[in-house]
Each structure stands twice: as C-alpha cells, then as structure tokens.
Amino acid sequence: MRKQKGFSLIELLIVVAIILIIAAIAIPNLLRARISANESSAASSIRTINTGQVSYYSTYPAQGYSANATALANLGPPAITGCPAGGPVFTAACLIDWNLSQATTVALNKSGYYFGVTSTSAAAPYLQYTVSGAAAAFNQTGVRGFCSNEDGVIHANPSFNAAPTVTSAVCASAAWPQL
C-alpha cells in the first residue's frame, strides 16, 4: 500500500489555532491604531477650521467669525464641485474643503468625527466662536473630544461622549486640557 502525502487533521488544526492566536493579538492593536489616526485627523480638522475662521473674519469683517447654525458650510464651498463661479461669498467662503464643511452629523463624519460651532453672540458680527469635535461612534472611531475657540488653542477631553456643542467656558475648563 502506498503512503498518502498531505497534512493530517491535527496539523491543520494546529496551523488554524496559531493563525487565530496571532489575529487575537493583532486586531485590537489595529483598532487602537485606527482610533489614534482618527483622533489625529480630528485635531488637525479643528486646526483647519481655526485657520478658516481667522481668514473668514479678515475677509468678511461685517460677519465676524462664521459662528451661526451653518458655520462650517459657510467656510466651505457650496457644492462638491467647488466655489461659486463669481468667487467666494460670505455664505460660501471656500476656506475649508467640502468634506470638512459637511461633517456636521454622525452620518456625514470626517475620519470618524463630526464637528459643531457655537457662539455667545446672538447675531453678526460674531466676535467669538467655539468649534468642537466628537467621535461619531464613541470607543470605535474615537474616544477623545476636541475643542478650540478664537484663541486657536486646541483642547482635548479624554473621554467625551456627547454632541459637539461645547461652549467657550466648557472648552477652557480643567476637564479640557490643552493638547
């Protein structure tokens, strides 16, 4: 009788077990790396919004900062196709990219975070603003919350699980240390 060549069932089970052990070690590290990348992107987005706000304030002094209900949309282009044919206007300043200007809800998040802008001013000119970012899926896309106001200093809350509607006073509190 000829001896058959190949792997035995035990050998195959051992190989599968080794692969599962390696996956069990690697997958959590991969998820933590993704959360870290999303948080870095969120902090960068806050910085981009701050830069856009300064440019907006300089370009449209009668409006002040873009700090009303459509603040992020005002900083970006009106459509994904780009700026209006006549050039930027205060309702479509084209200072930030389309994806960031639309990242105002969980469904329209940018790199796992969505953003909001609040103001203490009731009407234009808006002389103050606070921008904040929250994870779209807490503990999956991010853990920390981020905020900043017109001073440009970015603050982070180590476990922020709420909508991005942080006020200037909360952003400056001890619960939100500077980055």
Please provide the spans of the model-predicted regions.
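Conserved alpha-helical elements of the SDR catalytic core
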Residues: 26, 33, 53
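Aliphatic-rich helix starts adjacent to a transmembrane/signal segment
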Residues: 29-46
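A short acidic/small-residue loop/turn micro-motif
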Residues: 160-164
